[in-house]
């Protein structure tokens, strides 16, 4: 079964998304938030295409603007939490879609790059 493949923008982000210890450190010791991050990453990896994530209301998949145009965010846990996973859909050659019309590409995207996990609205 071919699932969504995740590419990480850097090693630090990869460690934060795959290590309970690193994720807990990122969230200031909040182990529940860290476990939620790892669960979100697992769900992304198990999806057939990115559309499977977009249609999940609890993920609150939404586009970003300004300097992050072409990127999207999903909640690490809930909308009440400030933490977001910032990601970008990539084509089969691992290039960003330009333009990135998510409605047109969601059913075919099988690769995403996770740029960062951040307190996006601080």
Can you describe what each PLM-predicted range is?
Residues 5, 63, 73-75, 86:
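Short, surface-exposed charged micro-motifs
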Residues 42-48:
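Acidic, glycine-rich loop-and-strand cores that form catalytic or ligand-binding grooves
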Residues 29-36, 52, 56, 68, ...:
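Generic, well-ordered alpha-helical segments
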Residues 49-73:
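A short, surface-exposed loop/turn module that caps and links secondary-structure elements
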Residues 40, 60, 68-72, 83, ...:
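A generic structural signal for short beta-strands and their flanking turns/coil linkers
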Residues 76-122:
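Enriched for short, Lys/Arg-rich terminal
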Residues 48-49, 60, 98, 105:
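Short, solvent-exposed coil/turn linker segments
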């Amino acid at each position: 079964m071919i699932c969504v493949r995740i590419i990480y923008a850097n090693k630090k982000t990869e460690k934060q998304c795959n290590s309970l210890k690193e994720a807990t450190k990122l969230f200031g010791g909040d182990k529940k938030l860290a476990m939620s991050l790892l669960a979100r990453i697992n769900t992304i990896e198990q999806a057939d295409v990115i559309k499977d994530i977009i249609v999940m209301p609890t993920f609150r998949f939404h586009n970003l603007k300004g300097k992050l145009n072409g990127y999207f965010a999903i909640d690490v846990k809930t909308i009440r939490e400030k933490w977001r996973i910032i990601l970008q859909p990539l084509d089969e050659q691992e290039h960003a879609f330009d333009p990135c019309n998510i409605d047109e590409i969601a059913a075919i995207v099988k690769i995403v790059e996770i740029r960062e996990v951040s307190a996006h609205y601080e």
